[in-house]
From Swiss-Prot:
Transmembrane segments: 212-232
Classification via SUPFAM superfamilies: Chaperone J-domain
InterPro entries attached to this UniProt entry: DjlA_DnaK_co-chaperone (IPR050817), DnaJ_domain (IPR001623), DnaJ_domain_CS (IPR018253), J_dom_sf (IPR036869)
GO cellular component: mitochondrial membrane
SS bond partners: none
Topology relative to the membrane: Single-pass membrane protein
Protein's name according to its UniProt entry: J domain-containing protein 1
Family: Belongs to the DnaJ family.
Gene3D superfamilies linked to this entry: DnaJ domain (1.10.287.110)
Function noted in UniProt: Probable chaperone.
Keyword field contains Membrane: yes
Residue span, J domain: 91-163
Protein location: Mitochondrion membrane
């Protein structure tokens, strides 16, 4: 039999002879046709499932001439198909269905084009007809914002470090907290020896102890102020009691010595006259008469002033 043209596995024409080569080539073509027919029938029968899962069918041939059909729903750097994340606050990586550690510019751009065509209000596919216009527009905006953030290297770096630049996720940390978290991560991942790790742990304990020291210091100051206020009030009360006692003793002494008379000139004259009358007279009538006479003398003395 004359030499026939044979087809290799990659689709290029190669020379071969013999009926066996020709039969193998025909068998390969029939296998390829059957595989393509099966894959097309599956894709046409379940378009919604394929769009939801993002499955991609590929026909490949083995070295022995057998054809196989594989469904690859995931590739390196992808979380899954075109399904939308279930969380209420998805990250830009979750919106685009990408893994944080395995994203390159080519995959990012390809994924963005797929999702943009899927959720664009004017070109939404049959799989997205169940979504309202507002929901499709919201998802389309999230896809655009996620692509704008991840395609910019500086914005993406800031988001990975401090979770800034993305308004649809959890609230970012304050600058002071973010700086502290970055410093702790840097110190942890750059600790080369056990001594560095020990120093890192001791620094954390020192910060914790210093915080407790501030609390104890504040409590001691408050207790000191309370003790000082108590001592001041106690001293005032003791001084007032002592002063009252001294005044009472002085009044009692004056009462014993002067019989209720004061220390001025007129009081001293009245006291002198009273003691003199007490020594001269014995009867009540005589004492009363002497008292009236003494009082007249005292009044004359006061009038003479």
């Amino acid at each position: 039999m004359a030499k026939r043209a044979n087809w290799s596995l990659d689709g290029q024409q190669s020379s071969g002879g013999g009926a066996a080569s020709w039969i193998c080539a025909c068998t390969d073509k029939i296998s390829i046709a059957k595989a393509l027919t099966r894959s097309l029938s599956v894709m046409l029968s379940r378009p919604t499932a394929l769009l939801r899962t993002g499955a991609r069918w590929r026909v490949s041939l083995t070295a022995s001439g057998r054809s196989t059909v594989r469904c690859a729903s995931t590739v390196a750097g992808w979380q899954g198909g075109l399904s939308w994340p279930q969380g209420k606050q998805p990250t830009p990586y979750e919106v685009l269905g990408l893994v944080k550690t395995g994203v390159d510019a080519r995959q990012l751009k390809k994924r963005y084009h797929e999702l943009a065509k899927l959720y664009h209000p004017d070109t939404a596919g049959a799989a997205q007809q169940g979504l309202g216009e507002h929901e499709r527009l919201r998802r389309f905006k999230l896809v655009n914002e996620a692509y704008a953030l991840l395609s910019d290297a500086s914005r993406r770096r800031m988001y990975d470090m401090y979770a800034t630049g993305w308004a649809h996720g959890p609230a970012p940390m304050a600058p002071a907290m973010a700086h502290g978290a970055y410093h702790e991560r840097y110190a942890y991942y750059n600790a080369g020896t056990w001594e560095d790790m020990q120093d890192l742990n001791s620094d954390r304990q020192q910060v914790q102890f210093s915080a407790w020291g501030m609390v104890v210091w504040a409590l001691c100051m408050l207790a000191g102020f309370q003790v000082m206020a108590f001592l001041i009030r106690l001293e005032e009360r003791t001084s007032k009691s002592a002063h009252t006692h001294e005044e009472a003793e002085h009044a009692l002494l004056l009462a014993h010595l002067n019989y209720g008379l004061d220390q001025d000139r007129v009081s001293r004259v009245r006291r002198f006259l009273w003691f003199r009358s007490w020594g001269l007279y014995r009867t009540k009538a005589e004492l009363d008469e002497a008292a009236r006479t003494n009082e007249a003398l005292v009044r004359q003395l006061e009038g003479g002033k």
